[in-house]
Amino acid sequence: MLKGHLSAEAQRFLCNEQPAPSGRSESTLADLRSATKAYITPAVKQVLASTKVTTRHIVINDVACLEVTPSHITASWPILYGFGGGFIQGSAYEDLTIAAPLCAMTGAALIIPSYRLAPEHPWPAAIDDGFSVYQALCERPFACVGESAGGNLVLAAMLRAKRAGLPLPRAVALLSPWCDLDMSSDSQVFNDGRDPSLSIQDSKTAARLYAGDHDITNPDISPINGSFDGAFPPCLITTGTRDLLLSLSVRLARCLRESGVEVDLQVWEGLWHVFEWQHQIPEAQQSLRNIAAFLKGHLSP
């Protein structure tokens, strides 16, 4: 245990005192979805009370969304936010432990598409939903944030926008982005069993249910394979040394840099996949402050 480098809260999490539900399979998916929501609901309620943000359900381009608004709006630009869950679980509500603090810290409204999930709605349903909302937001300055599968979603939407000649966001923040569904990167071997929130088997199951028999090298499925250039916005990527998808963040950062994109890759010692979801951990709070400062630095006057 890296006691000298981790907060007491992070150490407790790594000791499995607060394990998140896991074990994805098609037969148990409904139970896993319910268990995960029950697990995170107390934290969501606590965060909503402490941040004093408000939420309401809206519809944008026929896609149901959750709008998160700070008590005092100080930013004229919205944030398009993609929630995680391997495209087979998760919801806008469950990601409020990240989205609500970001909303309060930036003073910006967040729009979280409630995109359709696999296996009921496999690819390209989620990306279609995300891109529909993207199209409604992109005519004015805006930012994108996505965690895990939500990072995949916002990247894929940006690549679609680039191909269509639509405006790109002014800045994008990606938290442990699942940007490649080919489960063969180095960290997916050496961090399997070390990451308390994600396993290689869970990831393979999600990839199979989401992509089916489609070519996973398709940039709409694995956006790391997309065509990037210097027109892409500045990007902040966060990950941890225990993150099962650490290698994906490293590879994406290198790909973007080689394409002329401004990238800030922040690798947190001893932390795991989307550690920011655990709002009680001081490192998560600091990472969200970093993300908020990054977004405000690129969008605020």
Where are these regions (language model features)?
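A glycine/proline-hinged amphipathic helix-loop "lid/cap" segment
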Residues: 1-71, 301
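Alpha/beta-hydrolase superfamily serine-hydrolase fold, recognizing
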Residues: 18-24, 55-56, 62-301
